[in-house]
Amino acid sequence: MDEIKIPKATARRLPLYYRYLIFLNDEGKEKVSSTELAEAVQVDSASIRRDFSYFGALGKRGYGYDVKNLLNFFKKILNQDTLTNVALVGVGNMGHALLNYNFKRTNNIRISAAFDINPEITGTIMSGVPVYDMSEMKKQLREQQITIAILCVPQTAAQKTANEMFDAGIKGIMNFTPLRLSAPSSVRVQNVDLATELQTLIYFLDSDKDKNKK
């Protein structure tokens, strides 16, 4: 299939659609409308139709979408048949939680190596994942051909650690540190700031309260 250019917002929604289509398929449902899909994933139906339009004719007017066909299509688009090994860099509280989780709800992503400086956990297996000393990171990333990593180190060590990851061939980082990393143009960084997300949620809740008072 030719490469399809889609907006970032659309790309973020594709896994939502895919997960719900898995549910519908497991329930034995054969077709779904954009309205039903919108209610389930909390995305308006116009956005769903626009998202799907980037991939051509996926449904029929008046019929909706064939669940099995749509599921197979997004399975291919999201590369669900290929296992992606991910490195976890930093096994503190957040890193430990991610190790325990280890994407058990997905079949195509797993944390296969973790790195830390704590001698009490390096050289051990945690939640089925080997934990290496940070001094081995570049060597292990290269040998295991890992190109995606989750960064959970303290903010003060984030950029230095990221630079070493770039040198080892990392092409994508999910950054759980508060620092906005300086990265080469060839590397994609996805920032995950839980404090900011919570503050945004609180802001909207407070705004809703103010509206209700009027």
From Swiss-Prot:
Its main location: cytoplasm. Keywords: Cytoplasm, DNA-binding, NAD, Repressor, Transcription, Transcription regulation. InterPro entries: CoA-bd, NAD(P)-bd_dom_sf, Rex_DNA-bd_C_dom, Tscrpt_rep_Rex, WH-like_DNA-bd_sf, WH_DNA-bd_sf. GO terms for molecular function: DNA binding; DNA-binding transcription factor activity. Residues 16-55 bind DNA. Pfam families: CoA_binding, Put_DNA-bind_N. One of its GO terms (cellular component) is cytoplasm. It comes from the Bacteria. It is found in: Cytoplasm. GO terms for biological process: negative regulation of DNA-templated transcription; response to redox state. NAD(+) binds at G90, V91, G92, N93, M94, G95. Belongs to the transcriptional regulatory Rex family. NCBIfam families: PRK05472.1-3, PRK05472.1-5, PRK05472.2-3, PRK05472.2-4, PRK05472.2-5. Homodimer. Modulates transcription in response to changes in cellular NADH/NAD(+) redox state. This is Redox-sensing transcriptional repressor Rex. It comes from Lactobacillus gasseri (strain ATCC 33323 / DSM 20243 / BCRC 14619 / CIP 102991 / JCM 1131 / KCTC 3163 / NCIMB 11718 / NCTC 13722 / AM63).
